[in-house]
Swiss-Prot record:
It is an enzyme of class 1 (oxidoreductase). Pathway: Aromatic compound metabolism; 3-phenylpropanoate degradation. Belongs to the PheA/TfdB FAD monooxygenase family. This is 3-(3-hydroxy-phenyl)propionate/3-hydroxycinnamic acid hydroxylase. The gene is mhpA. Keywords: Aromatic hydrocarbons catabolism, FAD, Flavoprotein, NAD, Oxidoreductase.
């Protein structure tokens, strides 16, 4: 590992992340891989050791792959988990079992959050320039022209000024990212609104070890008598959720006898379960008025809250980290202008709002306690399932909003064209190179920008000037070919990696798109796409739109183009054990 060189700066760190939850830890890993000095401050003394989120999607696993930790995360997951919606008689109303893995991973995965979070924390041990400070709540901050002075409570983890004697410590950063949850102090300091609604409906949530059911899947019971959920997590843990009626108090719901009555509907011996924890929850549908104000930004629950019904709260936060991480790295390292950070809100807000709306709508469909309303819903759902296209729409989760950026760090050559791939995630099939066989595409592309050409040499298509600019930025270049042409050396270029289309997935993608040249961002979103002859013009437009600089970084103000190679994470002294 190459350490960052000395820099002329009065900043204690480049980025200060408030909150050591999954979003903050993922963001810190992304920044760590890019060589960005990062400090994570957390008011708790350690990670939360009980499950909260219960579902990972394919995009989250792809992000964990990008930070070199997916192999450590996978042992704590249940891949290809089926979710069934049941009526009052426990007959299947609908089923979600999406079969495709276009982004390289299953779309639905159960997981044990404390153990996955512990792997994210352990991943930071790879980076000498990333630190985590426990017992260090942010109590305030003051922004000026080139940085933010942050006040930390307690001893501030002995960072910066003060500390060690009970007095507040200070820390100066170039940017601050609040990943500090729904009650975010960062959001309050920013003076940003958090508009939306809080449901009046309460739910008893209980996690149980030694799963009394034992099957690998999950179900949601749309029972008007009492809606419920039963979710297989992993490692023998099952979550049950039961709606609490208006005439039942929180104290009643937390009584062990109440839980026994609820579980009696599900298991034969409800008094013989190993409860990890039980809590009463309400669901929130809220979004911050701004995700960025000056040098302060918000991510995860600090930026948006949504009901649990699509399992997208955790995953939406990971999307935030993936979108914001590379942009912060580019700006801090001198490879892009500060305006690039404006595209974070521009891109993430619309999709987060769509996820909130979908989750809220699903909750309303599941939760009616009026039998006539529930009966009408059941009839409608069953009628829809008779139509094959509608059944596939639900089964394959086609209703899930996918990120598609119309504005932001993208260039649309033909704005408004419905079939344009620009602003969407590129697929991740398994491919071959001359050195590796049967590997996921992202593992070949690396962690930064990538220029892909089907059936052409990127240098010849871009021209020497554009090629040199992307190379100076740290981008990599790839010639995509049918597998039959992998070993042909006629157009070899020392700066271009030849990729063989192992199963024909890449050709199938290009079969339905006119574009043959793709500019991929580090988060694997397609920043621009065009036919070969337009590549030089699109390249120039992208440098302008993303405020990129071809010099590849200023060593006085950033880390340049130094990247850290992801190594296996050693055991971390900060990691916590999950429930048995």
């Amino acid at each position: 590992m190459i350490a960052p060189g000395p820099r002329a700066t009065d900043h204690d760190t480049d980025v200060l992340v408030v909150g050591a939850g999954p979003v903050g830890l993922t963001l810190a890993n992304i920044l760590g891989l890019q060589g960005i000095r990062t400090v994570v401050v957390e008011e708790r003394d350690t990670l939360i050791d009980y499950p909260r989120g219960v579902g990972l999607d394919d995009e989250a696993l792809r992000t964990f792959q990008s930070i070199g930790l997916v192999e450590r995360v996978l042992p704590h997951t249940v891949p290809n988990q089926i979710l069934r919606f049941m009526d009052a008689k426990r007959r299947v109303l609908a089923e979600m079992a999406p079969p495709d893995a276009r982004f390289g991973w299953p779309k639905r995965n159960g997981f044990v959050q404390p153990l996955v979070d512990a792997e994210l924390l352990a991943g930071l041990d790879r980076f000498a320039h990333v630190q985590v400070r426990w017992g260090s709540p942010m109590t305030g901050c003051r922004e000026d022209a080139d940085g933010v002075n942050v006040e930390l409570g307690a001893d501030g983890g002995n960072v910066g000024d003060g500390g060690g004697d009970g007095h507040p410590a200070g820390l100066r950063a170039r940017y601050v990212v609040g990943c500090d949850g729904g009650r975010s102090m960062t959001r309050r300091v920013m003076g940003v609104s958090f508009d939306g609604t809080t449901s009046s409906t309460r739910w008893l949530v209980v996690d149980i070890a030694n799963d009394p059911l034992g099957h690998p899947n999950s179900e949601v019971g749309a029972d008007p008598e009492r809606p419920y959920a039963s979710i297989s997590i992993a490692h023998g843990i099952r979550r049950f959720e039961f709606m609490i009626h208006a005439d039942e108090s929180d104290e009643q719901a937390e009584d062990p006898e109440f839980l026994t009555r609820m579980l009696a509907r599900m298991v034969p011996h409800p008094d013989r379960v190993d409860v990890i924890r039980r809590r009463v929850y309400t669901h929130h549908s809220r979004i911050a008025g701004e995700f960025r104000r000056g040098r302060l930004l918000l991510a995860g629950d600090a930026a948006h809250l949504m009901p649990v019904w699509q399992g997208q709260g955790y995953n939406s936060g990971i999307r935030d980290a993936a979108n914001l991480g590379w942009k912060l790295a580019a700006v801090v390292s001198g490879r892009a202008g500060d305006k690039l950070l404006d595209t974070y809100d521009m891109e993430r807000r619309k999709h987060a709002r769509a996820m909130i709306d979908l989750s809220t709508m699903v909750g309303r469909v599941i939760s009616p306690t009026n039998r006539r309303v529930a009966g009408a819903r059941d009839l409608l759902v069953r009628s829809a399932s008779i139509v094959p296209t509608l059944k596939r729409y639900v089964l394959e989760m086609r209703f899930k909003p996918m990120p598609r950026y119309e504005h932001g760090a993208v260039v649309h050559a033909n704005p408004g064209r419905a079939d344009s791939p620009v602003g969407t995630l590129f697929i991740q099939p398994r491919v071959d190179t001359r050195d590796q066989q049967d590997v996921l595409l992202d593992d070949v592309l690396g962690p930064w920008f990538a220029v892909l050409c089907w059936n052409n040499n990127p240098r010849k298509i871009l021209g020497e000037t554009a090629f040199a600019n992307w190379k100076a930025l740290g981008a990599r270049f790839f010639a995509l070919r049918p597998a039959t042409q992998l070993r042909w050396t006629g157009h070899d270029d020392p700066d271009v990696v030849v990729v063989g289309d192992r199963r024909g997935d890449l050709k199938s993608w290009f079969d339905i798109h006119a574009e043959s040249v793709l500019f991929l961002r580090p988060d694997r979103c397609i920043a621009g796409a065009c036919i070969a002859q337009r590549a030089p013009d699109l390249s120039a437009a992208l440098f302008d739109a993303l405020t990129l600089t071809p010099r590849g970084g200023d060593p006085q103000s950033g880390t340049g183009s130094v990247l850290y190679v992801a190594q296996p994470a050693p055991e971390s002294s900060g990691a916590v054990a999950g429930p048995a």
